[in-house]
Amino acid sequence: DGTLYIENLRDAKTTDVYTLKGEGEEIWEPRFIFHGFRFVAISGYTTKPTLDNFTGKVVYDDIKTTGTFESSDGTMNQIFKNAYWGIRGNYKGMPIDCPQRNERQPWLGDRTTGAYGESFLFDNQTLYVKWLDDIKNAQTADGGIPDVAPAFWRYYGDNVTWPGTYITVADMLYQQFADKKVIEKHYASMKKWIVYMEANYLVNDLMTKDKYGDWCVPPESLELIHAKDPSRNTDGELLASAYYYHLLQIMKKFAAINAAGTDDIKYYDALSERIKSAFNAKFFNLKNNSYGNNTVTANVLPLAFGMVPENKESKVFENMVHEVEVTYNGHISTGVIGTQFLMRTLSEFGRADLAYKLASNTTYPSWGYMVKNGATTIWELWNGNTADPKMNSQNHVMLLGDLLIWYYENMAGIKSNPATPGFKQIIMKPDFEAGLNYVNASYESIYGLIKSNWKISRTNLVWKITIPANASALVYLPTTNASDVKVNNEKVSKSYQIEKNKLVLELPSGSYEINANNIKQ
């Protein structure tokens, strides 16, 4: 109706008042404040204002943009732009949840996996190194970590999924930037929290403490904030136990990296095995090959974390796919926790096409639904255009999950080899079969600019890549026939491998044009 929608801002003051002194040209800019907004209402102006009379200035940390992404899917491209603006607007010396309502807090759970995806778009290393210090400083004497740090809001809920961000962000800094210092600096504090949670909340080898559940799953009604249908929600003990197991695997890696932690590896191994055994004993349904109440989240977590009995993985995955494709008609049904691993798990187990469907949907619930309804950032809720304004931010990034990671690693094929952190060796393995016709992406790594620009025309692939100095790449092509492949217009030599129906080249730094005919999709 032409009026501003401010009901969802709660009691945040959204009005700036300036009194003209009435002498010539006057220029005014507010200080010590920022507003999150899309539209502005002007009153008291003596003439009809024009856009030239006002300048909107972006207030965010001085962080370099490091990533670009474009594909053949316009919806995916706009989602990327929305993510860029949303992330950018929430960098304020710490990663906050929203820039507009009376909150603006650095919630840990919003960045558990989000920090990883953001690292492809922005050089966020310094920001997150500093944030780890904030988290460490907020830790209690007995080891507890808050849900918000710095702990302006003193939410010491002692759940697993939000405080666990302390560990996952350190892992992101190591994987993306080869930063070992954060592990050395924070290892003792992270272990202290692990031990604290075990001592206080581990009962019969299962983690009993959970606070938020799979936060913000798409509700059954467009007017609801949270789902009331129990079939949509995942058991908190299942979530917490699986996530705690996942964090123990990261801590085991940290212990191997950090000389002071090598004696702890046996501790993490033993605790992990106990939890895995108890987890499967309680939550795995042998008859149905599913976990808990068979939500997508209940199944995706044990799949992503390697907790499923080896001979049951394919069955559990089939169950999960059935839920996505049939029960939810090819749409998202996960909340903040499940969405962190959804896209990559679908691709890893061979359904990149289904992941692409989720990424390109424009009907509720989906990221594309936000775009279709005029969003220019990412909403707090999947139904942000209709939900109760009590909790309905129009600029949150927590629902991105692992989408941006999937964009870069699975669509563009720009992934750091875990064995050589910081993109010393790049794994270039796009899911060509997903359904896109082309992707053009770049990422400014610590070694330099990485480019991946591929285009498929029927059964022919043209792929232009750039590998920075002092780095190398494993390049995966959708063929097993080397005679169909040329690199810089030269036939492939004998120095290649065949791995799971893909031809793999190891290339040193440089720029290449790869042509592959008769490719498999």
Regions found by a protein language model. Give the residues of each.
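Extracellular/oxidizing-compartment recognition motifs
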Residues: D1-R101, G109, T126-L127, P146-P150, ...
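Non-catalytic C-terminal accessory modules of carbohydrate-active enzymes
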Residues: A270, D353-Q521
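Alpha-helical support elements that line or immediately flank enzyme active sites
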Residues: D1, E29-F32, S43, D110-A138, ...
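Helix-terminus loop motifs that line ligand-binding clefts
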Residues: T3-K13, Q125-H226, T363-G384
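Structural helix-adjacent loops and short alpha-helical linkers that scaffold large soluble proteins
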Residues: Y45-N53, M76, F80, S119-D133, ...
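The feature captures the catalytic groove of carbohydrate-active enzymes
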Residues: E7, T14-D16, K21-G22, M94-C98, ...
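Conserved hydrophobic/aromatic pocket- or pore-lining residues that grip, position, or stack substrates
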Residues: V40, A83, G114, I135, ...
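Repeat-solenoid scaffold signature
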Residues: T327-Y369
